[in-house]
Regions:
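Expand to "…catalyze enediolate/carbanion chemistry for C-C bond making/breaking, isomerization
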Residues: 1-226
Length: 226
């Protein structure tokens, strides 16, 4: 399985459009798509404006260039807007998407809930990417990765650190701390091992020092080689 080396999330309209434009420009420059664009409903939709945001994502997906590599991050399966996201977006433009990202997955039961919803919406063959964001989810990573619909596991670093209630300092989210703090490093290893055991793709977490190209290079190198 081959996926682009980066998945770029954006949820604000102007940034979503800019991301799609940048993807097209870099695809032309390098002759291949070097990053996916994931249109974000979870963090992108304003409270109370979830339906309107879902319509916007649907419209942007349907009007994107045919060669664009697009995905959508929907709300978690226990969020009131999850089924609206599935119905309004995946039920109408799933053929234009490469995958759907399901955040805050805690168990195989969450994966099954998402799978049933996608199937009922007609997105029968759309792969699932899941975000592992809690200690309990890390504990169940092998079971989650074994699900046949799951294509990739991603590590939700910030929510994972937050879930520890101060046991992991903020430095654990930095480009150095995320590779040295025992609890964070253990989570990364569990996710990677679960993916390798099941033939899935492990995806590294965010790098907050995005303006530091050397920091990004160091993080990407460590993630791919260690």
């Amino acid at each position: 399985m081959v996926l682009p080396v980066c998945d770029h999330y954006s949820g604000v309209e102007v940034r979503m459009r800019k991301s799609l434009q940048l993807q097209a420009e870099m695809t032309q420059e390098f002759g291949a798509c070097v990053f996916d664009v994931t249109l974000d409903c979870e963090d992108g939709a304003p409270v109370g404006g979830e339906i309107e945001h879902a319509h916007l994502v649907k419209e942007m997906t349907s009007s994107a260039a045919p060669e664009a590599r697009l995905a959508v991050r929907v709300h978690p399966v226990d969020h009131p807007s999850f089924f609206d996201d599935v119905d309004l977006i995946l039920g109408r433009v799933h053929s234009r998407l490469r995958h759907v990202m399901i955040p805050k997955v805690e168990s195989v039961a969450d994966v099954e809930t998402a799978t049933r919803a996608l199937d009922q919406a007609g997105a029968l063959n759309l792969p699932l990417h899941v975000l592992i964001e809690s200690p309990a989810a890390v504990h169940r990573a092998f079971e989650i990765a074994a699900h046949p619909r799951v294509q990739s596991l991603s590590f939700g670093l910030m929510d994972f650190v937050s879930a520890h209630g101060g046991a992991i300092p903020a430095s654990g989210m930095g480009v150095q701390g995320q590779f040295t703090h025992p609890l964070v490093l253990r989570a990364k290893l569990e996710i990677a091992s679960a993916c390798h055991a099941n033939g899935k793709v492990p995806s590294h977490c965010v790098v907050t020092e995005f303006s530091d190209l050397n920091a990004i290079k160091v993080a990407a190198t460590k993630a791919s080689r260690e």
